[in-house]
């Protein structure tokens, strides 16, 4: 597991230098769905990790409780000492010593660091999902305004054509033509204002897109790296724990054999 997490962490560090094919593209429903699925997987990952650690503790506690029933009171008292926290001491049957040491070591494993980084990463994923929703909302707003602008431009062009045609008819009064031209000028001013509004919304969408890209490209690799680093630390601590347990077990067995002679 140590080698696996080291490899995964190294890959996440290298990912920062790669060009993502989706970079710069607009967010769509499939992207948001993938984000939700990733959040669910990380939540399940954390739940499985917590269950894994809890299962180990529950198993050793049950085994310790069962073995304690066969230990004489004086040995039991000496094994526990004055502290309620199990200590790696060599007294009592070897199996009981291993259980006590195992429980003590399990409590010292950095499991909280792992769950903390996973929860932090889940928050980053949720923040991305929300940001993707805001980007999509802004994109729909821009698309709607763009369609409306096209309709307004088409209506303006038709009105402009009718006014130009009316100028060619001699029976059309100058006052009526002037009124239509003023109407057209007013509509053109409104059209220009609408274009400015659309440009402002496009700028908002561009900014929203940049925020989405920043979260995806920067916070995601960092979040994954933090998770793998914490798991790497947990795995190394676990590796050392089992090595120490093996050493304690051998020493306890030797002492037990010497005491029985």
Where in the sequence are the language-model features?
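Extended alpha-helical coiled-coil scaffold domains characteristic of the BAR superfamily
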Residues: 1-261
